[in-house]
């Protein structure tokens, strides 16, 4: 197992949410999860969703909570179907437990840099997410972008693939960000010193007809529709 996946054992996962979403994303990457990342996720996630590189399940857990009873009115429960994909089975197991929807949740241990066997089932989803995943994958921007093609068979024709990643090039990091970048890359958790937004956008445009992106702070947010 790669170090970036091995790091997330059952104990470390509990600290992940606080460190990443309350400290690193705010002070290091200037792309706060609460005001940017979570609204971005919520606006694109569909009833049938595949979450790739799920980590602790922060994003699907948040959407699940928001779909429950609020202000005395019942909202349709999310999800209809949820597939949690990660290289580390600890991540998918913990995320599935936290989401709390066992009847409609499945888990899959897979490497997105390789063709995903489950694609042979021809099940497709309304949405696929890669939130804070690409900067953890080993290799160049071009090799990481193979993940888009591997995930494309899972997406409905009218579905959306979306995600976010911390950039190494094309942005100016502050001192704290540079420190976290150095430490994370030295430990093999990140592999993003060479990651430029244009590389990912070009790769997405090869697999999808409609691609949108924006850089917030040091983070690339992207959406891709109409798989070709």
From Swiss-Prot:
<dbReference type="InterPro" id="IPR016584">
    <property type="entry name" value="MeTrfase_VrtF"/>
</dbReference>
<comment type="pathway">
    <text>Mycotoxin biosynthesis.</text>
</comment>
<keyword id="KW-0489">Methyltransferase</keyword>
<dbReference type="GO" id="GO:0032259">
    <property type="term" value="P:methylation"/>
</dbReference>
<dbReference type="GO" id="GO:0008168">
    <property type="term" value="F:methyltransferase activity"/>
</dbReference>
<keyword id="KW-0808">Transferase</keyword>
<dbReference type="InterPro" id="IPR029063">
    <property type="entry name" value="SAM-dependent_MTases_sf"/>
</dbReference>
<comment type="similarity">
    <text>Belongs to the methyltransferase superfamily.</text>
</comment>
<dbReference type="GO" id="GO:0016114">
    <property type="term" value="P:terpenoid biosynthetic process"/>
</dbReference>
<protein>
    <recommendedName>
        <fullName>Methyltransferase verB</fullName>
        <ecNumber>2.1.1.-</ecNumber>
    </recommendedName>
</protein>
<comment type="function">
    <text>Methyltransferase; part of the gene cluster that mediates the biosynthesis of the neurotoxin verrucosidin, a methylated alpha-pyrone polyketide that inhibits oxidative phosphorylation in mitochondria and thereby causes neurological diseases. The carbon backbone of verrucosidin is synthesized by the HR-PKS verA, and further modified by the other verrucodidin cluster enzymes.</text>
</comment>
<comment type="pathway">
    <text>Secondary metabolite biosynthesis; terpenoid biosynthesis.</text>
</comment>
């Amino acid at each position: 197992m790669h170090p970036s996946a091995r790091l997330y054992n059952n104990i470390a996962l509990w600290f992940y949410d606080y460190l990443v979403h309350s400290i690193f994303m705010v002070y290091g990457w200037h792309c706060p999860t609460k005001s940017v990342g979570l609204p971005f996720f919520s606006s694109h996630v569909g009833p049938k969703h595949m979450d790739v590189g799920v980590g602790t399940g922060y994003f699907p857990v948040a959407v699940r909570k928001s779909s429950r009873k609020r202000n005395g009115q019942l909202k349709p429960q999310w999800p209809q179907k949820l597939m949690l994909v990660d290289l580390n089975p600890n991540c998918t197991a913990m995320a599935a437990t936290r989401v709390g929807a066992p009847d409609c949740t499945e888990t899959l241990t897979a490497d997105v840099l390789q063709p995903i066997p489950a694609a042979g089932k021809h099940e497709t989803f309304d949405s696929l997410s890669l939130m804070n995943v690409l900067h953890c994958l080993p290799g160049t921007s071009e090799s990481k972008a193979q993940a888009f093609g591997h995930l494309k068979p899972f997406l409905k024709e009218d579905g959306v693939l979306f995600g976010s990643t911390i950039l190494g090039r094309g942005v100016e990091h502050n001192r704290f960000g540079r420190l976290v970048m150095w430490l994370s890359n030295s430990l093999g958790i990140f592999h993003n010193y060479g990651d430029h937004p244009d590389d990912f956008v070009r790769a997405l445009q090869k697999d999808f007809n409609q691609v949108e992106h924006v850089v917030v702070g040091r983070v690339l947010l992207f959406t891709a529709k109409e798989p070709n």
